[in-house]
A protein has these predicted regions:
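Short C-terminal tail/terminal secondary-structure segment
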Residues: 1, 145, 225, 236-250
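Conserved glycine-rich cofactor-binding loop
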Residues: 16-17
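Substrate-binding pocket helix/loop in short-chain dehydrogenase/reductase
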Residues: 96-109, 201, 205
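A short, exposed helix-loop element centered on a Lys and neighboring polar residues
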Residues: 120-121, 165
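Alpha-helical segment proximal to the catalytic Tyr-Lys
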Residues: 125, 169-170, 233
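Catalytic loop of short-chain dehydrogenase/reductase
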Residues: 136-160, 164-173, 185
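Short, small/polar-rich loop/turn modules that mediate ligand/substrate recognition or access, typified
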Residues: 172, 177, 235-237
C-alpha cells in the first residue's frame, strides 16, 4: 500500500531508542525525510544510520523551552519545513500520588505538556498554510485508565491529550490531522526498567494482556506511519488504543 508520504519531512522526538526509533524507521521506509531528535546525539546518529533515506540528527532537551522552540527551524534548515510532527517523551519517574515534589512536577510538565504546546505553536501555522500536516502523540493508555504508581505520567499525558484533541478540531478543515496513540505494553527499555527486566514484563503480559504478549516496536512504527499517511486523512481528534486489548474502557 502506498501511504502517499514519500518526500514529506518529519520531526520525531525521542527517536534514539524504543518506540520513537521504531517510528522514525517506519517513516523512513516510506520515503519520509526524518529529523531524529533526543538528548543523546551519539544514539541518534546510530539510529539514523539504520534509516535508508535522508535524515538529520538534532540534539535537544525537551525540558528546555528555548531549545524546543528552536527545533523546527533547525529541522527546516536541514530538511525542509516540518510536515509530520511525532511527539514522544520518555519517563517521567514512577511514584505514588503524593510522593513527587514540586521540582519533579515542574520537570514533567515542561517535557510532557509544554514542549508539545511549543512545537504545535511553531509547526501548525506552516501546516495550515500548506494545507497538509500530521501530528501524532506517542502517549499511554493512562490517558484513559490511570496506571498505579505513575502519577506524573498519568496527569501530564492526560493534559497533553486534551490539548491535542482541542487543537485537532480547530485545524481539521485545513488538512491537518492530530491524533494520540494510547500505548500499551511494548518491548522497550522503558518497560523493562519498570518491571525489572523484559522477561518479567513478558510474563506479566501473558497473564493480563488479552493478546497474551508484549507489543513489538515495529508494529507500533507501522501504525504511526499509517496515521501519518494520506490514507488516514479523515482520522483526527482521537486517541487510538494500541495495547493488545488491555484497556477496558471504550
Amino acid at each position: 500500500m502506498d501511504l502517499g508520504i514519500d518526500g514529506r519531512v518529519a520531526l520525531v522526538l525521542g527517536a534514539s531508542r524504543g518506540l520513537g526509533r521504531a517510528v522514525a524507521e517506519a517513516l523512513g521506509r516510506e520515503g519520509v525525510r526524518v529529523a531524529l531528535a533526543a538528548r543523546s546525539v551519539d544514539e541518534l546518529e546510530a539510529a539514523a544510520a539504520g534509516i535508508g533515506g535522508e535524515t538529520a540528527v538534532v540534539g535537544v532537551d525537551t525540558g528546555d523551552a528555548e531549545a524546543v522552540a528552536a527545533l523546527p527551524e533547525r529541522v527546516a534548515a536541514a530538511l525542509g519545513p516540518v510536515e509530520i510532527l511525532v511527539l514522544n517523551t520518555g519517563g517521567p519517574p514512577g511514584g505514588a500520588a503524593l510522593e513527587a515534589d514540586l521540582e519533579a512536577w515542574t520537570e514533567a510538565y515542561r517535557s510532557l505538556v509544554l514542549a508539545p504546546v511549543i512545537l504545535a505553536e511553531r509547526c501548525v501555522p506552516g501546516m495550515r498554510e500548506r494545507g497538509w500536516g500530521r501530528i501524532v502523540s506517542i502517549s499511554s493508555t493512562s490517558i484513559r485508565e490511570p496506571i498505579p504508581n505513575l502519577t506524573l505520567s498519568n496527569a501530564n499525558r492526560a493534559a497533553t491529550a486534551g490539548f491535542l484533541a482541542t487543537l485537532a478540531r480547530e485545524v481539521a478543515a485545513d488538512g491537518v490531522t492530530v491524533n494520540t496513540i494510547a500505548t500499551g505494553r511494548f518491548a522497550t527499555e522503558r518497560l523493562a526498567s519498570l518491571h525489572g527486566s523484559i522477561e518479567a514484563a513478558e510474563e506479566q503480559a501473558r497473564a493480563d494482556v488479552p493478546a497474551a504478549r508484549l507489543g513489538r516496536p515495529e508494529e507500533y512504527g507501522d501504525l504511526v506511519a499509517f496515521v501519518c499517511s494520506e490514507r488516514a486523512a479523515y482520522l483526527t481528534g482521537t486517541a487510538i488504543p494500541l495495547d493488545g486489548g488491555l484497556t477496558r474502557s471504550s
